[in-house]
Amino acid sequence: MKKGKADPCNYLFRRARVIDPARDLDAVADVLVVDGILTDIKPNIDLPSDRLAHFAVIDASEKWIVPGLIDMHVHLREPGEEYKETIATGTMAAVAGGYTAVACMPNTKPVNDCAAVTEYILERAREQGHCRVLPVGAVSSGLEGRSLAEFGELKGSGAVAVTDDGRPVANSMLMRRALEYAKNFDLPVISHAEDPALSEGGLMNEGPTSTLLGLHGIPKAAEEVMVARDLALAELTGARLHIAHVSTAGAVRMIGEAKSRGVPVTAETAPHYFTLTDDRLMTFDTLYKVNPPIRGPADVEAIKRGLADGTIDAVATDHAPHSSIEKDTEFEYAANGIIGLESALPLILELVREKTLTPSQAVAKVSCNPARILGLPLGTLLLNQRACMTYLDPEFYFVLDCTTFRSKSRNCPFHGQPTRGRALMTFFNGKVAFSRLSK
């Protein structure tokens, strides 16, 4: 990188591969950022030498510039569990991973089921956040599954969706009412698809490995029964339904069939569901304990097919920080969850290297598709606006080392894994929020 007398946030990227699926753009181009404003994208940008002296000129050959990534499913733990993560540390982890927006789940303490908590989260994000924070409100008051939260109040204060994530809405009538109510406010309802009667006491995927280990399993039906119910309710109400963390082949099939009938449903999965299989638990390593559980090889392949054919719209991390005490204990008592903000990008790019996804498809899963699902004008490169983009090297080789993560927690099962693909710079709101480039 040629720095010279560059002014703050003046950058000229030369010969970058610019991928913006929302604009159907995938081309080699120069990219100009002037005073933090994304000013131009075209094959060759010539600046007079006296003006060029005020820019950092970066040879971006073989690198990508993409819209700032969006993770539509994270747990920032604030308020109430700041020993696991805070808005400050979680959003720093996000920009280190290439993300410029994160949607945070409502299972905080107190639960985000009212305007006061939503407003608190947004205020903390303004004060200490490093990227955009998108609060998701609760479906039910206190996540108790008894009565609906005030969706209008939640949306009015800044919530972008509603969910009881971390637990299902077990009462079918309440879920129906939630979909009908949310439709009035054009809010998607995010379903944590789990039948609690079928999953009760389960510690991992039900199958040969759970039998061998003597661990109580969670059958695929625990997810699929609830997916089927919620698809039926979405079809009945015409409301927008989003299925979170899809993990089974049966769920992929049902979602695909529902889409073909015109049901207004979208879906996400997480990197661990297309990367890991349940035999990883043979060592009883609690880093692999997550809900829904890591499944078998056939499910992994089905998830990949669902991503490729568009059945699964988005990849979200389900970033779920936990303290070492909560993970370093007997398997039965260990908390469920994996952090993912700083490990997701190389795992997603592996789908490109193995030709499951094209580069444009992969970028869409973490940019314009989540933005579309949440109904937000994000996930695209907007000219003459404050730069919100990610500069990445898809072939950057490194070993994932959770001891260097910006997240407060270390529960990452990919620690020590050699991998490729990393964010080099993350621009948010016209500023460099994170950079790995030398000064």
From Swiss-Prot:
Zn(2+) 1 binds at residues 73, 75, 165, 318. Zn(2+) 2 binds at residues 165, 192, 245. Pathway: Pyrimidine metabolism; UMP biosynthesis via de novo pathway; (S)-dihydroorotate from bicarbonate: step 3/3. Substrate binds at residues 75-77, 107, 291, 322. The active site is at residue 318. Its cofactor is Zn(2+). Binds 2 Zn(2+) ions per subunit. This is Dihydroorotase. It comes from Syntrophobacter fumaroxidans (strain DSM 10017 / MPOB). The gene is pyrC.
